[in-house]
């Protein structure tokens, strides 16, 4: 998606006659820099290892957002218990072999998303503790994240990338249009310190 509309050009210091292809290319550079498909609302799926003896995980793409008519940002949610290593089984009164017979570890369990405590801005999900006190080992989450309205700093960054491109000798600034792939080729130099600072809050978290 384009992060600037034609009606925004003058507001952000661009010529009103700027071709939308410049904005399209600059928006693609922003997506690549932020390691996201888009900063708009999008659906993601992540399979995440649960930290030992904790019942929380953090999603990579923020903020989590609810898409009507849903009542939660989570679309589907599954989790499973891991097979403990030697000496880690916490219930001496119940043998691990007994638990395995009833498929406690290793099996995926569907969880009602409405039972999860969600922090939309941090992306943290807190799971209820199992009746036996067991912790999940891994979770698979399908969720919605992004912005319905593109934040102003992202729009400023988009305009700045276009300005940087138009000031780059290697680009054909005589043409009103710019090839997207050509502009992306120069992406490393077009994303200057100012742009990096503006986009820092919108980067995907962890290794996404």
Identify the residue ranges that each predicted region occupies:
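Divalent metal-cofactor coordination and adjacent catalytic microenvironments
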Residues: 1-208
């Amino acid at each position: 998606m384009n992060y600037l509309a034609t009606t925004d050009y003058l507001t952000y210091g661009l010529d009103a006659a700027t071709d939308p292809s410049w904005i399209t290319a600059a928006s693609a550079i922003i997506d690549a820099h932020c390691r996201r498909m888009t900063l708009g609302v999008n659906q993601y799926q992540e399979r995440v290892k649960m930290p030992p003896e904790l019942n929380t995980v953090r999603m990579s793409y923020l903020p989590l957002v609810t898409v009507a008519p849903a009542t939660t940002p989570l679309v589907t949610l599954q989790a499973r218990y891991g097979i403990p290593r030697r000496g880690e089984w916490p219930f001496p009164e119940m043998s691990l072999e007994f638990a395995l017979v009833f498929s406690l570890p290793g099996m995926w369990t569907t969880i009602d998303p409405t039972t999860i405590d969600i922090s939309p801005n941090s992306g943290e999900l807190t799971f209820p503790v199992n009746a036996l006190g067991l912790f999940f080992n891994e979770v698979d989450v399908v969720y919605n994240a992004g912005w319905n309205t593109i934040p102003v700093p992202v729009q400023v960054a988009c305009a700045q990338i276009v300005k940087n491109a138009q000031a780059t000798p290697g680009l054909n600034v005589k043409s009103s249009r710019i090839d997207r792939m050509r502009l992306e080729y120069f992406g490393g130099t077009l994303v200057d310190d100012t742009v990096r600072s503006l986009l820092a809050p919108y980067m995907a978290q962890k290794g996404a």
